[in-house]
Amino acid sequence: MSTEDNHDSQILTARHRSDASEQSFKSLFGGPSSEDGKETEPDTHDHNHSFSNAKAPAKFANQNVAPFLARHIPEQYAPLGAQSILPADLSSANSKYCYRHRPDQKCRRQADEPSMDKLQRELESLPQGDQQSISHVWSLFSAAPAKHRKLILQGIMAQCCFPQLSYISATVRDLIRIDFITALPPEIAFKILCYLDTTSLCKASQVSRGWRALADDDVVWHRMCEQHIHRKCKKCGWGLPLLDRKRLRESKREIELRATTWDKGVVGPRSPDASAESPPSGKRKLEDDEVAVVKRHCSSLGSDAGVDKDSDFFKTRYRPWKEVYKDRFKVGTNWKYGRCSIKTFKGHTNGVMCLQFEDNILATGSYDTTIKIWDTETGEELRTLRGHESGIRCLQFDDTKLISGSMDRTIKVWNWRTGECISTYTGHRGGVIGLHFDASILASGSVDKTVKIWNFEDKSTFSLRGHTDWVNAVRVDTSSRTVFSASDDCTVRLWDLDTKTCIRTFHGHVGQVQQVVPLPREFEFEEHDAECENDDLSTTSGDADPPSIQASMGLEPNAAYSQSSAFGTSFDNGRAAPPRYMVTSALDSTIRLWETTTGRCLRTFFGHLEGVWALGADTLRIVSGAEDRMIKIWDPRTGKCERTFTGHSGPVTCIGLGDSRFATGSEDCEVRMYSFQS
């Protein structure tokens, strides 16, 4: 057979297959076939082909379409008026299941209303015969089961040209997108949203009202606050400060007022301005669980007869967690980029050696022998405490009292609200240059090289001896009943108050150690980032096991047994261990981060040009002040200096650190407060 004969044979075979496919397609959709004695229109009249079934008589459509509809959707189509009976498999089907996982289910995807309106308008614009033909096609496809639908679609797409296939591809791309957040149960939707960052959550809340309700829910933002507030997020590296304690106190007082002192003449809670004008209440300091006091429900409301519990007064007032995060995020961003306002306090006539601030109260001590109390909001000097005969080197206050230490060898307790000196303690043989109290325990460090412990409950006192030079700073940790001390002998010591012995000595500084600050227990440090420099330079007391036992046994850092092994037998399972991390500063111009359980120096911070006198730290940052008149902000995990502040004309001698502020005192007689509030 010649090449031309083969070619002609292939063409005839292709035409035969095409005609057979076309006849099958027309038969499926009710169009006339060649078997009915009608010729096929030429290709130039393809439009007439599309609606050839429009010329079919109503009897033909009824014979082909009606039985198909009655067989597959009897509950919707019963042309003979017979009672529709659902098949057993369909009547028992659970429509709550996705049809993809239940083959006996039909797709119940809801049609898009705007799209259907558009289709309806286009359909109505066609002639009556064309409308009937298209409706028949739609009805057949709608009634067909899944297997038949696929066959119908395959037949349609087999006859589509490339522009039509391109249209299908573009249309399907949008149709297969589903609103999974709205379709899923809320619990699963919350789980998904909890994986998003803040930017993605804010974008998700703009999708629709349904998405906004879920993306703004407290479940999602409470999780976000847990990951970032008062700690560094392991995923994004961001950490945000705690809630403003003043705002927490005001919210707590408002709840207490509504719960206990309500009367019928009160129409609402106290205004924030009224709360802000009142001085601190003198109650105990806020505990950690009070961070979320604004979210608590007030359940102890009055039950007097005739009281309308549905009134606005009795409605629980919540502060959304998203608002909490937003507030803290602004402050955290200001910290990161150094955006702050500065307020200067002038009044001392000699160098400022110590300070502390809480809410709107600032206390400063100076070599001019006075203590001054300031209002941080107005900058006004409220009162001056006089009584010491020499320079004041250290102080600390709470809601009810202020304790100060002076070079005149005395410790004084003041009522800082009235300026009255309540009592004076003597016991040191040299000037008192460091003190710290927690609960009923007061520790003081002195020029006489000792640490003295004062117990306000049983009125007992004792001394801790071991340093060979001035003790510059002390810190009490009542939960573990231990004390940290820093000295001019270039060491830091950890003392056990129960045994009155030194349980660890930290060596590493080559200059006089001026400050020691235990870090909060929430602080976490990645061990692989440690710059272990002097593992063998720290020593322990005779009854303590070697520092490396914790690592060698593979125990968790905060496990009770490992802590007991690290600090000695006196730390049994029921006794808390000291804070795991601490930071120190010295006149060797460095700051060091230590692990107390092993005695290792994990990181050394370099950057100051002269000795570091002042130090403050929390879970997010370290703030230091030095002889070089500079203040530096450090990331304790990376060791990076994030920001440097200047402005003092003398050495920076003291620092107070808060969540959104820090204050510095200098030998230039000034105090500067840096506020990062938005």
From Swiss-Prot:
Gene3D superfamilies: 1.20.1280.50, YVTN repeat-like/Quinoprotein amine dehydrogenase. Residues 178-224 form the F-box domain. GO terms for cellular component: nuclear SCF ubiquitin ligase complex; nucleus. CDD domains: F-box_SpPof1-like, WD40. It holds the Pfam family WD40. Residues 35-49 have a biased composition (Basic and acidic residues). SMART domains: FBOX, WD40. SUPFAM superfamilies: F-box domain, WD40 repeat-like. The keyword Iron does not apply. GO terms for molecular function: ubiquitin binding. Pathway: Protein modification; protein ubiquitination. Keywords: Repeat, Transcription, Transcription regulation, Ubl conjugation pathway, WD repeat. WD repeats lie at residues 347-375, 387-415, 427-455, 466-496, 508-543, 553-595, 607-635, 647-675. Component of the SCF(sconB) E3 ubiquitin ligase complex involved in the regulation of sulfur metabolite repression, probably by mediating the inactivation or degradation of the metR transcription factor. Component of the SCF(sconB) E3 ubiquitin ligase complex. This is Probable E3 ubiquitin ligase complex SCF subunit sconB. The gene is sconB.
